[in-house]
């Protein structure tokens, strides 16, 4: 559950735009493996008290449904992606069944072949596999996520409610066997903190790499939503999302779009609610989320991101 402040009592949140501005003004220009240089900063923290609103960026519209109606909004695609990974999705077909359609450029036959994967397969080192089928020395995959929820319910005061997307042998290169994932996990290091006395739940999230104008927009949706979801199924009130980024960057071909977004006025964050009838984390779907009080300053716009 979550208790939002009335919309007119919320304070406009500038943390996302502050990060964009920091990268623009102090970022170091570096080469990347994508062939496009980037400005980057190392180490950035944000804290979102969820009573002040759900962190959906207002610098551009991500919740408007496409005019053709064939696919969900970007907001609901992000939620579909989250629900897919929470259920162990590993292929583009799996993701599309949950309503996420943006993985196509990373799962082409040519790209997958580089890592010994069939077309459409994100690989055994991807998020869904790590969350639900983490490999073990004993040979039996370990379901991190299910055990995490059970542990929160059984031992709420424990300090090790943690989740990791990182399976080193499938991600790191330079070892026998090679990489087995189309994109090394950029996000997904989660630590859940429960105050059993106050009945509140805070989630801290670490992201190793953030494409600030594009990927980060949807990652903020992911982990704010996950905070609400875990709180609902374990019986706590969602309190705060604490967000840490190791490497935050803007590609040089995104600079014009970023400057346009920064020219907008800061807005209050919207209200996002969940279907209160859902009591199983793995039963959530994108359609169980509703957004209101969302007032973006720019229409939906496509921003380049290297593959």
What are these language model-derived features?
Residues 1-307:
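Terminal, non-catalytic protein-protein interaction segments that mediate quaternary/complex assembly
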């Amino acid at each position: 559950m979550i208790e939002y402040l009335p919309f007119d009592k919320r304070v406009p949140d500038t943390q996302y735009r502050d990060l964009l501005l920091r990268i623009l003004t102090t970022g170091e220009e570096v080469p990347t493996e994508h062939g496009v240089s980037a400005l980057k900063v190392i180490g950035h923290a944000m804290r979102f008290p969820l009573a002040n609103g759900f962190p959906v960026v207002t610098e551009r519209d991500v919740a408007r449904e496409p005019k053709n109606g064939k696919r969900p909004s970007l907001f609901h695609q992000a939620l579909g992606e989250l629900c897919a990974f929470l259920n162990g999705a590993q292929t583009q077909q799996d993701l599309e069944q949950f309503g996420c359609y943006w993985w196509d450029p990373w799962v082409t036959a040519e790209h997958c072949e580089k890592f010994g994967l069939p077309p459409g397969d994100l690989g055994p080192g991807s998020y869904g596999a790590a969350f639900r089928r983490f490999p073990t020395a004993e040979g039996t995959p370990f379901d991190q996520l299910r055990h995490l929820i059970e542990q929160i319910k059984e031992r709420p005061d424990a300090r090790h409610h943690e989740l990791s997307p990182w399976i080193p042998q499938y991600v790191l290169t330079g070892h026998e066997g090679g990489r087995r994932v189309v994109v090394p996990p950029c996000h997904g290091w989660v630590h859940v903190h429960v105050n059993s006395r106050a009945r509140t739940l805070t989630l801290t999230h670490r992201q190793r790499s953030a494409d600030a104008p594009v990927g980060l927009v949807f990652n903020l949706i992911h982990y704010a939503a996950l905070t609400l979801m875990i709180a609902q199924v374990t019986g706590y009130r969602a309190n705060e999302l604490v967000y840490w980024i190791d490497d935050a960057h803007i590609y040089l071909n995104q600079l014009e779009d970023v400057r346009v977004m920064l020219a907008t006025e800061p807005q209050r964050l919207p209200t996002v609610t969940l279907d209160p009838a859902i009591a199983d984390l793995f039963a959530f779907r994108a359609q169980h989320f509703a957004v209101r009080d969302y007032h973006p300053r720019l229409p939906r716009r496509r921003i380049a991101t290297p593959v």
